[in-house]
Structure formats: C-alpha cells, structure tokens
C-alpha cells in the first residue's frame, strides 16, 4: 500500500469503496477508475443515507471537487 492518496486509490481499484461527498451525500460502489483531479468512476453504485440504500444507480462518474473522502 502506498502513502499518497492516489496510491491508495490505485490499491482500491476494482474493490468496493464508500465515497462521501459535500452535502453529506454518500455512495458505495466498485471503483473502476480515477484521475489526478480525483474524479471517480464507480460501477454498481448505490446512494446511501444513514448506511441504508436509498437508490441503486449503476455506473456513475463523481466529480473530484465534490469528494470529501474515499474509504476503501
């Protein structure tokens, strides 16, 4: 495992992650890709509220400037 944030994202590729966004929105899905701006591509994504599934989205691109944290 690397020390830098992008190393951690690289280690998390093709695994399930939880992404917290500004405004307290939260998504869970399989991390398929990312870039240097921390834009994320999730597959099998679900929107969560209080740990419960609100809706299933499928594939989604999340803009990096909205990301608060990514939990592998």
From Swiss-Prot:
Pfam families in the cross-refs: LSM (PF01423)
Cross-referenced SUPFAM superfamilies: Sm-like ribonucleoproteins
Sequence ranges assigned to domain Sm in this UniProt record: 4-72
Domain of life (superkingdom): Archaea
This protein's GO CC annotations: ribonucleoprotein complex
Protein name stated in the entry: Putative snRNP Sm-like protein
Gene Ontology molecular function: RNA binding
Record-stated family: Belongs to the snRNP Sm proteins family.
InterPro entries according to UniProt: Lsm7/SmG-like, LSM_dom_sf, Sm, Sm_dom_euk/arc, snRNP_Sm-like_arc
Species in which this protein is naturally found: Methanococcoides burtonii (strain DSM 6242 / NBRC 107633 / OCM 468 / ACE-M)
Record PANTHER family: SMALL NUCLEAR RIBONUCLEOPROTEIN, U6 SNRNA-ASSOCIATED SM-LIKE PROTEIN LSM7
Disulfide bonds: none
Keywords assigned by UniProt, alphabetized: Ribonucleoprotein
HAMAP family: Lsm_RuxX
């Amino acid at each position: 495992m690397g020390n830098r944030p992008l190393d951690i994202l690289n280690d998390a590729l093709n695994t399930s992650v939880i992404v917290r966004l500004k405004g307290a929105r939260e998504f869970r899905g399989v991390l398929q890709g990312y870039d240097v701006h921390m834009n994320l591509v999730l597959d099998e994504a679900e929107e969560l509220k209080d740990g419960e599934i609100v809706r299933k989205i499928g594939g989604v691109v999340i803009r990096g400037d909205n990301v608060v944290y990514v939990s592998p």
